[in-house]
Regions:
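Primarily membrane-embedded glycan-assembly and transfer machineries that use lipid-linked glycans
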Residues: 1-43, 60-206
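Internal transmembrane alpha-helix with an interfacial aromatic "cap," most often the third helix
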Residues: 45-60
């Protein structure tokens, strides 16, 4: 992931200071590898490990090599265990979750549609539509910042959720979702909306 980030400027390495990165590392999550797949197409099959997080990345950074790699992996997995999609779907109702867009003030994230031609806005909106459960799930949002200022401010706000988690045990996933929206999603929305049209790069370029 560090190699992919540094290809477009060392300022992107600031992402390792974001609270969701450390939350994911502590819990041994897939999110860093899913983010890396945005820079290395052959890693795109990693998005299949957590489809609810991988789908926004896969849809906003598609390449023929990545799609081919995913197709091969899915085909092989079906040959080994043909029933796995039904087994996976059968456990979905057990997944404690929330959808950021549906938790107040999450509906504000629909404002990303004002920048519908910007792939960063699309990534933000797709992520907000996906079921999530903890702070590390937002790490893919750090594909959105491009400038040093954008990284610094979004990282700063992310630690608001970190401090909250440190001093307060959330009572529900809805409560977790509200703090995720406030400290991760809304700052990213501000980045997308305030970025000048001439400064709108693609997700994987700077």
């Amino acid at each position: 992931m560090a190699l992919g980030l540094s290809r477009h400027g060392y300022r992107r390495l600031l992402v390792f200071l974001a609270y969701p990165y450390w939350a994911g590392i502590i819990e041994a999550q897939w999110t860093p590898l899913i983010m890396a797949s945005a820079f290395f197409p052959l890693l795109l099959p990693a998005t299949l490990a957590k489809p609810q997080l991988g789908l926004p990345v896969a849809l906003t950074t598609p390449t023929w090599r990545g799609v081919l790699a995913c197709t091969v992996l899915i085909t092989l997995s079906l040959l080994v265990m043909p029933r796995w999609p039904w087994l996976w779907a059968g456990h979905f109702y057990l997944y404690n979750r929330f959808v950021p867009l549906l938790i107040v003030p999450g509906p504000l994230l629909a404002l990303a549609l004002l920048r519908y031609r910007d792939r960063d806005a699309l990534l933000l909106l797709l992520a907000a539509l996906m079921p999530q459960r903890w702070f590390y799930d937002t790490f893919i949002l750090w594909l959105i910042p491009k400038t040093r200022r954008e990284f610094i401010w979004t990282i700063f706000f992310s630690w608001g959720a970190g401090l909250y988690r440190w001093y307060h045990a959330p009572h529900s996933y809805v409560e977790v979702g509200r703090w995720m929206v406030l400290f991760m999603y809304l700052p990213m929305l501000a980045v997308v909306l305030l970025r000048k049209a001439a400064e709108k790069p693609s997700i994987a370029t700077a």
